[in-house]
Amino acid sequence: MKIPAPSRGGRRGRRDRAAADAPARQVDYRRLRNPFPQMKLYSDDEIAATHDAALTMLEDLGMKILLPEARRIFAAGGARVDEAGEMVRIGREMVAAALDSAPRSVLCRAARPDRDVLLEPGMLVFQPGAGAPHATDLERGRRPGTGSDFRELIKLTQHFDVLQMVPPLVEPQDVPMNLRHYFTMEAQLTLSDKLPFIFSRGTPQVMESFEMLRDFRGCDDAGFMNESHCYTIINTNSPRQIDIPMARGLIDFARHGQLSIVTPFTLMGAMAPISVEAAMTLSHAEALAAITLTQLVRPGAPVCYGTFTSNVDMKSGAPAFGTPEHFRASLAAGQLARVVDRPWRCASGSAANINDSQAANETQFALWGCLMAGATVVIHAAGWLEGGLTVSYEKMVTDMEVLQMVAELCADTAPDNPQVSLDALAEVAPGGHFFAAAHTMARYQTEFYEPLVADWANFGSWTDSGAKTASQRATGIWKDIVSRDAALVHDAARIGAMQDFIAARTAAGGALPES
């Protein structure tokens, strides 16, 4: 085989000429499948024993269910109910029937078909940090969350395709509680075309949010109830309790065909036993109880199994995340989720107070626990600080770098065939370089991931450019994104109708949360 002599000059000119013809790099981050093999921390027998222990807990110890209607529904389904103690004991045959009817695959409808979210085992969906009372950034500092923060963080969530669902992000505390659901719903519908979130804070707020969403999307009642157009997060009150708004949310969302993501929040050593195995028994049982309630309300109602199990600092009681115990609990949750064979939710996160190396280490370690466990939905994957007390604008951006790189690993790529590889090798002589090779020139603009935040410049160039840290570079990125107008086109009549709805409900006093 004749090996051509490598070119020694003209690289810049050839690249400039190629630039005019090269296509823009396009990778689909919207519908990801987890490419990694799922890890097994425990044997199949150990996981089966944990599942059986959870069923025994539900049968013998039971759950405290604070909502009378939920207790009546459980009783009608065959559970043993102690009204005086508000305790419900759920037979394993009830759980088995619920798991049989709960869908294995849920297609959630967004504003556009290319934003729809498919939840089933093997899929991978990311969400940023959710439900924080505070926001922070390098320019304005840490502060109680506001309506302005909420809208800006919606813009950031909308901007990045690797975030497929909109979470509650921060609490807009300058908006009264009786009006807050109008504000958050309007912001989600006008600033994003992704799957929206609705808090379970009582039937009046949920029903009004459903009405806003249904009318804005142009759905009739039947069309709305036959497909999921939104979701809620259901946190049990561990240990072994479901409170009134959470039980109410499970019922309301199931009855109207909307998705509930069940999430026992079990901190080992605090609201859960201190060992991973015992904590996961509790978490699994609580999730099964909530799933069973949804299926008693409406067989086939969309529901997602979930867990959020980590440990606490036993010196202070403060939650810890991104720990070895958090990782182990995620792996155990993945194995238990495969027993029920339904889509499931896990979480990343960090207890760090600022966007520093601790924050990055904890978030990434927890993220890899979710990925190795095979989680369908990974919540708190970007921006989450202080164990959920704060969402950081800069961390939203720096975490996005990691999520996009993970998404790159999920993307389908066509490998070079062996002959192309041999041709590329034959093009360059021993000791030469591939910068100017034809194989390189045909691919260099689209072959590699382009970093969002990372700076690959050498020290001198980095210094000349201001010696900015990753967080400082992230500030410029988020400011640019939130300064732009949302590039969404909405029907003016629907915007007007929604504004009229909000004005009328506001004049009538809104709707207070229920507890």
Question: Language-model segments: which ranges?
Answer:
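Short beta-alpha connecting loops at secondary-structure transitions
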Residues: 36-39, 315-321, 349-355, 383-395
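Helix-rich catalytic cores of soluble enzyme domains
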Residues: 141-376
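Structural signal for hydrophobic packing residues in well-ordered secondary-structure cores
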Residues: 46, 58-65, 78-81, 99-106, ...
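Catalytic-core signal marking the mid-to-C-terminal active-site face
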Residues: 2-16, 20-29, 41-51, 61, ...
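N-terminal intrinsically disordered, cationic/polar leader segments
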Residues: 1-40, 45-47, 55-59, 65-77, ...
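Glycine-rich phosphate-binding active-site loops on the catalytic face of alpha/beta enzymes
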Residues: 369-390
